[in-house]
Amino acid sequence: MALKRIHKELNDLAQDPPAQCSAGPVGEDMFHWQATIMGPNDSPYQGGAFFLTIDFPTEYPFKPPKVEFTTRIYHPNVNSNGSICLDILRSQWSPALTISKVLLSISSLLCDPNPDDPLVPEIAQIYKTDRDKYNRTAREWTQKYAM
């Protein structure tokens, strides 16, 4: 079941790729993918290329994929291990969701962080109280790690 669904999503991604995103298997292993999200325009991540790993469980799509950044990023919802705090990757997962929708959700999280559900409270606090400092630091990290 999982493999059939993963193949279908790969075909769908090839035919209708999400804006500024790409993803596909690493080598022959269909359960292990690499994805790329380009830093959205009008965000401090603009111009950066952010790499992520996607690991599908054997119960996919009934269990969510494990998606993590491998590129360092300064963001209140992404910790230093690359873990992402996003409801659809946890409690709000639905088998109707696809990798395309997940990547678009992560991309929109880059534009609109959720400081009220942070993985990194210190960054969330800076985002809430000193947006200029947040944007400056996020841009510096993007230039240092994603370009």
Swiss-Prot record:
Q: What CDD domains is this protein classified in?
A: UBCc_UBE2D
Pathways involved: Protein modification; protein ubiquitination
Specify whether Nucleotide-binding is a keyword of the entry. Answer: yes
Tagged with keyword Zinc-finger: no
Active-site residues from the entry: C85 (glycyl thioester intermediate)
Q: Which reaction does it catalyse?
A: S-ubiquitinyl-[E1 ubiquitin-activating enzyme]-L-cysteine + [E2 ubiquitin-conjugating enzyme]-L-cysteine = [E1 ubiquitin-activating enzyme]-L-cysteine + S-ubiquitinyl-[E2 ubiquitin-conjugating enzyme]-L-cysteine
Q: Cross-referenced InterPro entries, in alphabetical order? A: UBQ-conjugat_E2_core, UBQ-conjugating_AS, UBQ-conjugating_enzyme/RWD
The record's account of tissue expression is: Testis-specific. Mainly expressed in the round spermatids (at protein level).
UniProt lists the family membership as follows:
Belongs to the ubiquitin-conjugating enzyme family.
Task: Please identify the protein, giving its name as recorded.
Answer: Ubiquitin-conjugating enzyme E2 D2B
Organism, scientific name: Rattus norvegicus
UniProt lineage: Eukaryota, Metazoa, Chordata, Craniata, Vertebrata
